[in-house]
Amino acid sequence: MTRVSVVGCGNMGGAFVKGLGQHDEYDVTAIDPDETARESVADNALRTTADPAAAVDPIVVLAVKPDLVDPVLEGLDLTADQTLVTLAAGVSRSFVSARTDATVVRVMPNLAAEFGEMAAAATHEGLSEEVRTLLEAMGTVAEVDESLMDVATAVNGSGPAFVFYLIDAVKTAGIEGGLDPTQAERLAAQTFRGAAATVLRDDRTVDELVDAVCSPNGTTIEGMEVLWESDADRAVADAVGAAERRSREI
């Protein structure tokens, strides 16, 4: 059994605890000073505590906001035989490494870790097979150079919010057309899920898949013409760019 301490049980840390908690091979200690945060993951961790000194496991996940990294690290007495997985956006591996004796790997995950559908980017440096296996228990991991972590933060870290926004737009259009809100949400969300699965499993390019759905003079091509003539792709690119810039600023 692999023992893991998760320091910080907010949105991202909580998703990690819940994701790992679904696997019997992980013994998880959830650490957070906030009682409500601890209670939110109590059913998924073998133990919860407010004491950072409890972070004695071989793998420690640091899941706190960027401005809390420094003070939290001061309270963690990690050793050279531990690995620290830092999830803080915009905080460099070197910044963290200078403040701990543990081996450091920088990871940008997303909230889908809770459901085993996470897309994560991890730095080459510090990424052991044990940590890779841990991440893969919650989804997919791409190993990247740290210079690419800011754009990865925008694509897979912030990306779920962009997709949620698009799902809601499709859902709203369905409701305006007469669908029941629950039906519209289910159909929209499952359509995005199915489209993503197709992209991952089909050998065709995204453009080829679009063509496969667009029959001449059909309904899809009519809708695609509207998207092609709009600035939708530019708006998405701008959103990713803005998130990347913010990651560099933090």
What is each residue range found by the language model?
Residues 1-50, 59, 99, 117:
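NAD(P)+-binding Rossmann beta1-loop-alpha1 motif at the extreme N-terminus of oxidoreductases
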Residues 3, 26-27, 83, 103, ...:
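Residues at the starts of beta-strands that form the adenosine-phosphate
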Residues 16, 189-250:
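NAD(P)-dependent Rossmann-like dehydrogenase/reductase catalytic/cofactor-binding core
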Residues 98-103, 119-151, 163-201:
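Internal alpha-helical scaffold of NAD(P)-dependent oxidoreductase catalytic cores
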